[in-house]
Swiss-Prot record:
This is Uncharacterized protein AF_1237. It comes from the Archaea. Heme 2 binds at residues 141, 144-145. The keyword Iron applies. Heme 4 binds at residues 223, 226-227. Residues 1-24 form the signal peptide. Transmembrane segments: none annotated. One of its GO terms (molecular function) is metal ion binding.
Length: 297
């Protein structure tokens, strides 16, 4: 019996090793390259698109996908949750208050607290910028939350709201453009004021580069540009999802999933723009998370 068990264990290890080799190294963090680049240069030229302005640009061809994402947790910041004190209720980050970022909205998600603007640290601590994931400029909660172009999300559809989504936060090759904290720090996404005096985001990447870099599904660096800084900085809210994961070598040492060649969307697939999760530290309950066994590896 021991001989049989040893044989089975050896076979399993060999199979796992072969799977890891087959997955190969991805572009950024060791994940498999299972995405496709869809060059939009020709279609943007045909439609006279000379500037990427979020979903205002994309809705011309992808209205159904824009509406899908508009109603998602990533944009609205709330979803229907079951099992809260035995009840089903609408809740999410839009209504919440915590010790990290305090509150984005008050009055049950109806009044904005600090959505967008621009502040800098007058006197940053010595060596501050050398810390992984640190930065001296802040643009408010919208820097990560809402995946938008600057306007606070509204549950009511309107032309302005449907044009307020930053589609390329997830659908651009991350070596060309990322959103979130990382995008702000790298100067890829800046704040300005529109003709009504409202703060808005503008993308500081040449349009022709963006058009050639559109991908069909997010890569892990797209996700980490926001999620690695949850709570306002590195290792604050979720020590297991940190800027270290942006470095392929550190990621392999830090996380078993990245080491095995997995990426975020291998489990959180984003089908219909719903990124399933059952984590106890998030309110998002849209879609189904990947089924995880007791010994999944």
């Amino acid at each position: 019996m021991r001989a049989i068990n040893k044989f089975l264990i050896t076979v399993c290890i060999a199979l796992l090793a072969s799977v890891a080799v087959a997955l190969g190294d991805g572009e950024e963090t060791g994940e498999a390259e299972e995405f496709k680049v869809i060059d939009h240069s020709k279609v943007w030229e045909e439609k006279g698109i000379t500037k990427y302005e979020g979903s205002k640009t994309c809705i011309q061809c992808h209205e159904d996908k824009v509406r899908q994402f508009f109603h998602s947790y990533h944009y609205q910041l709330f979803s229907e949750n079951e099992g809260i004190n035995g009840k089903t209720m609408i809740f999410g980050g839009k209504m919440a208050f915590n010790d990290y970022c305090m509150a984005m909205f008050v009055n049950n998600g109806t009044k904005v607290v600090n959505w967008i603007g621009y502040i800098t640290l007058k006197k940053a601590p010595e060596g501050y910028e050398d810390l992984v994931g640190s930065f001296t400029g802040l643009t408010g909660c919208s820097m990560c939350h809402g995946v938008g172009m600057g306007l606070p999300p509204s549950p009511q559809e309107s032309e302005e709201q449907l044009g307020n989504i930053d589609c390329l936060a997830c659908h651009a090759k991350p070596d060309v453009y990322v959103s979130g904290v990382l995008g702000i720090k790298l100067g890829l996404k800046n704040v300005t004021k529109d003709d009504q005096g409202r703060w808005r985001y503008v993308i500081n990447v040449p349009t022709e580069e963006l058009a050639k870099s559109i991908i069909n599904r997010p890569q892990s660096k797209n996700c980490l540009a926001c999620h690695a800084f949850s709570g306002g900085g590195p290792h604050l809210k979720r020590p297991n999802i940190a800027p270290d994961l942006l470095n392929p070598e550190l990621a392999a040492e830090f996380d078993v999933h990245f080491k095995a060649g997995l990426g975020c969307t291998d489990c959180h697939s984003g089908e219909n723009h719903e990124f399933g999760t059952n984590s106890v530290d998030t309110w998002s309950r849209e879609g189904e998370g990947a089924e995880v066994q007791q010994l999944p590896h």
